[in-house]
């Protein structure tokens, strides 16, 4: 369960932003979307390598 402590006089919108950030970090929604359809381990591994290549390429272009 996610708990967001509120300080005295803190804006509700700030608390909602904190909650959303914490919720995103847990990865619940991402996991649920991933489990909607079975994906073979080989496909998952291929996606990871392609993403790693893409990120590495972006870092090289940045330099």
Swiss-Prot record:
<dbReference type="GO" id="GO:0003735">
    <property type="term" value="F:structural constituent of ribosome"/>
</dbReference>
<dbReference type="InterPro" id="IPR001911">
    <property type="entry name" value="Ribosomal_bS21"/>
</dbReference>
<comment type="similarity">
    <text>Belongs to the bacterial ribosomal protein bS21 family.</text>
</comment>
<keyword id="KW-0689">Ribosomal protein</keyword>
<dbReference type="GO" id="GO:1990904">
    <property type="term" value="C:ribonucleoprotein complex"/>
</dbReference>
<keyword id="KW-0687">Ribonucleoprotein</keyword>
<dbReference type="InterPro" id="IPR038380">
    <property type="entry name" value="Ribosomal_bS21_sf"/>
</dbReference>
<dbReference type="Pfam" id="PF01165">
    <property type="entry name" value="Ribosomal_S21"/>
</dbReference>
<dbReference type="GO" id="GO:0005840">
    <property type="term" value="C:ribosome"/>
</dbReference>
<dbReference type="GO" id="GO:0006412">
    <property type="term" value="P:translation"/>
</dbReference>
<protein>
    <recommendedName>
        <fullName>Small ribosomal subunit protein bS21</fullName>
    </recommendedName>
</protein>
